[in-house]
Amino acid sequence: MSIDKSYCGFIAIVGRPNVGKSTLLNKLLGQKISITSRKAQTTRHRIVGIHTEGAYQAIYVDTPGLHMEEKRAINRLMNKAASSSIGDVELVIFVVEGTRWTPDDEMVLNKLREGKAPVILAVNKVDNVQEKADLLPHLQFLASQMNFLDIVPISAETGLNVDTIAAIVRKHLPEATHHFPEDYITDRSQRFMASEIIREKLMRFLGAELPYSVTVEIERFVSNERGGCDINGLILVEREGQKKMVIGNKGAKIKTIGIEARKDMQEMFEAPVHLELWVKVKSGWADDERALRSLGYVDDL
């Protein structure tokens, strides 16, 4: 009697902040589990996204962007989370942006050179490159930097060549039993995903000052008798001025954030959601390792 073979492996998606790692993960999975915004440092935790197709299960780790600035405790922890993801995977997808190459890209590359896993280079946002003639010389420059498994120009936003990345991943998955049931798309809890959705809306609707200074704690997440979820979210900021910014004029901003977050939650959880949001000042949380631990920033290191 023949036993069907199965293939399974872990793939880290790495790169400097804001190159499109989370957008690529969402496209590879065919749905949204990692939060995205135009602001750098949107991803603060390692998100595991799972894509199962027949005998093949690819388990993607979406890391925080690696960067050289480590002044605050939260930045140091994010770098640690990203670095530790590189060490224990079968494959790495290194995401860079168009024809840009920065010291942070160089730093990520140096970390990858130290590792053993083969690396696919995904050159993202190629649709945004104004001077198309610059693209080929830049790809040749990148090819000279390391012995990449493959170099694929992509647009994570439009999906251009994302199927090529998925095919390369599938080809390099080792023979192994699947780690997760086939209907799983993430190993994160609904409570965690609710906090990430609220944080994404905060990033999307607030000014450039806020990304580092805001986080979300889910204080209550219960099923109700109507088959839906009652969720209470606490938004923590560092200063009184930021609290006013989050609430907005006559509460307009927090209302918009709540409406948009609720829509995404209902789509993700496939159930009606009753969401209530509060804002609280907790000064210095991003510098305080104990506070970060209590907010879940250290549990996956």
From Swiss-Prot:
GO terms for biological process, alphabetical: ribosomal small subunit assembly
Subcellular localization: Cytoplasm; Cell inner membrane
Q: Which UniProt keywords apply?
A: Cell inner membrane, Cell membrane, Cytoplasm, GTP-binding, Membrane, Nucleotide-binding, Ribosome biogenesis, RNA-binding, rRNA-binding
Where do the record's region annotations for G3 lie? 62-65
Q: Domain Era-type G spans what residues?
A: 7-175
Amino-acid positions noted as binding GTP in the UniProt annotation, renumbered to this chain: 15-22, 62-66, 124-127
Start and end residues of each stretch annotated as G4? 124-127
Q: Which domain of life is it from?
A: Bacteria
A molecular function GO annotation:
GTPase activity
* Matches recorded under Pfam families: KH_2, MMR_HSR1
- Looking at the record, which segments are called G1? 15-22
Looking at the UniProt record for this protein, which Gene Ontology cellular component terms does it annotate, in alphabetical order?
cytosol; plasma membrane
| Topological category with respect to the lipid bilayer | Peripheral membrane protein
Regarding protein family, the annotation reads: Belongs to the TRAFAC class TrmE-Era-EngA-EngB-Septin-like GTPase superfamily. Era GTPase family.
Job description of the protein = An essential GTPase that binds both GDP and GTP, with rapid nucleotide exchange. Plays a role in 16S rRNA processing and 30S ribosomal subunit biogenesis and possibly also in cell cycle regulation and energy metabolism.
Q: What is the official name of this protein in its record?
A: GTPase Era
Organism of provenance:
Shigella flexneri
Gene that specifies this protein: era
